[in-house]
């Protein structure tokens, strides 16, 4: 399994950083529940979904649900286990147990109980979708696919988050065309359009399926040479792979058709800075900032470029601006420390470098 760009140095489960699985599970829970609640047409099958809103939950589950809402998942599970010990056949218990373990990010246990829930009621959309998500988050995309496909097949307008997860599962099982179909549905564009290839290329790049991402982006260019953001994506890919001349060429092509895109100027400046074309980097960074003064990245890169040019006062001003916008970015303070040291201001340098180290330790505890 290849690591993702976002989690290159973080242990991951199928492209999801381990430290993020709990929050992602909660996020997907919230949106899957909302998506199911918004559906108007019941699924086809032997029965309608048996999942009920918390307000109509059986009395025996009320305490467990209250504990869950308070974030006391272990206590909620213990409460459900006491019900299980008294009567393992209690209707709806398997779904309650599976949902509790899902929220706890204990996906093997969630799968165990959610399989029971779907066996008892194959048309229970909540149990089916949670089981699919549990398989995905637990690192079993192949098992997740048929369940998420089933949920999508039940409804004319499937939950967007489920469509995204389904597309990622297709990528992880190397079924790229099916992934494209899922993302086309997610973004409401034709399956064979340039946009569908662009969206799929973006998702492939995020998962670091670089050769396929490049292939799909090139297909998008073939279908629509003036489609915005295709050359930007290719530029990002080449920059990530340190193919700097190719990255520069792609960013320049993007600006020719999309001259108001601030991020392209920023990425082009990054590419210029890597080959020490600092004057050009400074010029396009100014354009990026003029177009979007709310992003810290261009200010940070401007500080680095100006420091390389020996313009330390201006570098400090750019970096201080970035620090004002985002005081908790350790990179900004580290660069400020370097700039102050270049200026001979040792006291200010030590203060910034110490703060950078503290922020780095706080954000990445070992």
Predicted regions: what is each one?
Residues 56-89, 99, 103, 168, ...:
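Alpha-helical segment of the N-proximal tetratricopeptide repeat
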Residues 70-78, 104-116, 138-150, 173-185, ...:
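Structural signature of tandem alpha-helical TPR/SEL1-like repeats
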Residues 57, 91-92, 125-126, 158-161, ...:
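Helix-start (N-cap) detector for alpha-helical repeat units in TPR-like alpha-solenoids
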Residues 86, 120, 153-155, 188-189, ...:
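Structural marker of alpha-solenoid helical repeat scaffolds
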Residues 42-48, 331-366:
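Terminal, low-structured helical/coil segments at or just beyond the last alpha-helical repeat
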Residues 96, 130, 164-165, 199, ...:
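Canonical tetratricopeptide repeat
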């Amino acid at each position: 399994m290849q690591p993702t760009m976002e989690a290159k140095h973080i242990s991951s489960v199928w492209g999801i950083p381990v430290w993020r699985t709990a929050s992602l599970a909660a996020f997907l829970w919230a949106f899957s529940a909302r998506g199911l609640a918004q559906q108007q047409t019941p699924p086809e099958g032997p029965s309608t979904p048996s999942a009920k809103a918390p307000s109509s939950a059986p009395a025996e589950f009320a305490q467990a649900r209250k504990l869950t809402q308070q974030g006391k998942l272990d206590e909620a599970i213990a409460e459900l286990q006491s019900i299980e010990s008294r009567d393992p056949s209690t209707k709806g218990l398997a779904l309650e147990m599976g949902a509790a373990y899902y929220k706890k990010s204990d996906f093997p246990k969630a799968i165990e109980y959610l399989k029971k829930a779907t066996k008892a009621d194959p048309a229970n959309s909540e149990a089916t979708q949670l089981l699919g998500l549990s398989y995905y988050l637990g690192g079993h995309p192949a098992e997740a696919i048929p369940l998420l496909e089933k949920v999508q097949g039940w409804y004319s307008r499937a939950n967007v988050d489920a469509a995204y997860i389904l597309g990622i599962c297709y990528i992880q099982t190397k079924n790229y065309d099916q992934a494209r179909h899922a993302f086309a549905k997610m973004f409401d564009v034709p399956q064979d359009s340039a946009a569908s290839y662009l969206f799929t290329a973006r998702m492939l790049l995020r998962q670091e399926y670089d050769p396929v991402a490049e292939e799909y982006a090139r297909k998008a260019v073939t279908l629509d040479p003036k489609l915005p953001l295709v050359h930007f994506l290719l530029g990002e890919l080449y920059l990530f792979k340190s193919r700097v001349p190719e990255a520069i060429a792609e960013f320049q092509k993007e600006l020719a058709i999309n001259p108001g895109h601030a991020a392209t100027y920023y990425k082009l400046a990054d590419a210029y800075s890597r080959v020490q074309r600092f004057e050009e980097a400074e010029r396009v960074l100014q354009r990026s900032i003029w177009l979007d003064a709310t992003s810290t990245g261009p200010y940070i890169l401007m500080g680095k470029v100006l420091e390389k040019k020996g313009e330390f006062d201006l570098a400090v001003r750019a970096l201080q601006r970035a620090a004002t916008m985002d005081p908790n970015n350790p990179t900004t303070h580290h660069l400020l420390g370097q700039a102050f040291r270049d200026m001979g201001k040792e006291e200010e340098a030590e203060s910034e470098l110490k703060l950078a180290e503290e922020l780095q330790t706080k954000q990445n505890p070992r």
